[in-house]
Amino acid sequence: MYCAKLILLLGCFWISSSASDPADPLLVDLPNGKLRGRDNGNYYSYESLPYAEPPVGDLRFEAPQPYKQQWTDTFDATQPPVSCMQWDQFIRGDDKLAGNEDCLTVSVYRPKNSSRNSFPVVAQIHGGAFMFGGASQNGHENFMREGNLILVKISYRLGPLGFVSTGDADLSGNFGLKDQRLALLWIKQNIASFGGEPENILVIGHSAGGGSVHLQVLREDFSKVAKAAISFSGNALDPWVVQQGGRGRAFELGRIVGCGQASDSVTLKKCLKSKPASEIVSAVRNFLVFAYVPFTPFGPVVESPDAPEAFISQHPVDIIKSGKFAQVPWAVTYTTEDGGYNAALLLEEQASSGREWIVDLNDRWFDWAPYLLFYRDSMTTIKDMDDYSRKLRQEYLGDRRFSVESYWDLQRLFTDVLFKNSTEISLDLHRKHGKSPVYAFVYDNPANTGIGQGLAQRTDINFGTVHGDDYFLIFENIVREPQLRSDEETISRNFLKMLNDFVLSENGTLAFGTCVFQDNVGSSKLQLLSITRNGCENLELESFP
């Protein structure tokens, strides 16, 4: 049904060749009416444009509905996008509630470049563990300075409002993924009105955004809305992306907010729709074992095959093995210390005792590890879970205790289990079952400050090249200092050129600086590009280093 809806929407496209009025580029015509953006010096912005009806009231916990309202006055597109309602890990203190339930918008940023009449497009799906974040969490000044690409940022439902699921057709889940999908359709339909090229759309994302991008690619009809895709430090096989146990969490959520009498999905859904959104989102605190662990209590699920408009009804591994996914060029990446998220959190000192969380891990490993590393719901028995916890500790720590001194070994464990291993598995499956080019790179060049320092709230630890150190050279983020080093400046420009050339390539070629990525499809070995401060190098490997 979802595919049929896509074809219907694609058949109704209203596409123009450029912004409506060349004499006034801030004024744009859409099927809904006229809108006016802002002049930002070297680019124009058109922000907070609704692509779906507000997901409130009866539309809460439903697939998004295309925005159909007509504007009688000129729409004010100068207001920055609001974040979707969330329990935000990066808000200090006990009250982490932020955002608004009415949030399904896209924001368009168009270069001032008189040398060209149209621009290729990069659509960005933000990260945040499917729980927090928003279109405004990353800056775009670096991105827009080159003047060659239109950027579109997508907002989508998060946390329980975006991903609660009972595992059946009545409360199927994946509403946030369906939001992203509708936003991509909106971009395909409307971007020409801003001077964008609907035939040249690249979709990228970082962390949960990267996992989202991969999940979008795993739908065969993704090729109708985009030409290529890149998943930075996140893919559909990461253990925190597609999870089990959603039904239990859905009914536990109901119990917390006063829907404990519900014994079936229909009753639960009706009751949850009647509750204030703030109560539903604030209930996230009850699913955290300590601090912000697990970092994704609500995320994507495999939906029931009979669910209306199901986004995915098979596990990603099975989808890839079937070959029934979009055959578009796709790249997947990781950093050498990606596991700094969320491992660095364990170095924070507890307000109550002054001890780091990592010290308490010695006594709580068997309790906490399944939540930290996302295998709590995938194990059949407690014994299986304990055996796996014991195996991991022995492999990475041996007989040593968890401490600040042994932190790097713990971070390596997090990197392998949460990011690197699943990146390698994804790459291996795609090279065996895909047809379009599949690429990969690893980034090793630590930022002076990054997400590690932000989580640990300390600057005396060297975290290495952590989660976001590459992506934040494309889109600024407050966790790192804004001033780039000279080597980072070069890498940033190479990344931007990489995106530009990738979306324009007719044969899916991908290059960074002087290095051309090697395609993994049909290769007997893994092809991995290594990017460091000294340049780039193609590696041919049996397994990731």
Swiss-Prot record:
KW Chloroplast (keyword) present: no
Disulfide bonds: 84-103, 259-271, 515-536
One cellular component (GO) term of this entry: extracellular region
Naturally occurring in which organism (per UniProt): Drosophila persimilis (Fruit fly)
Keyword list, A-Z: Disulfide bond, Glycoprotein, Hydrolase, Secreted, Serine esterase, Signal
Keyword Glycoprotein: yes
EC supergroup of this enzyme: hydrolase
A GO MF label: carboxylesterase activity
Oligomeric form and interacting partners: Homodimer.
EC number: 3.1.1.1
UniProt family annotation: Belongs to the type-B carboxylesterase/lipase family.
Active site residues per record: 207, 467
Main location, first listed in the record: secreted
Database matches in InterPro entries: AB_hydrolase_fold, CarbesteraseB, Carboxylesterase_B_AS, Carboxylesterase_B_CS
Subcellular location: Secreted
Signal sequence extent: 1-19
Name listed for the protein in its UniProt record: Esterase-5B
Reactions it catalyzes: a carboxylic ester + H2O = an alcohol + a carboxylate + H(+)
One Pfam family linked to the record: COesterase
Gene3D superfamilies reported in the protein's UniProt record: alpha/beta hydrolase (3.40.50.1820)
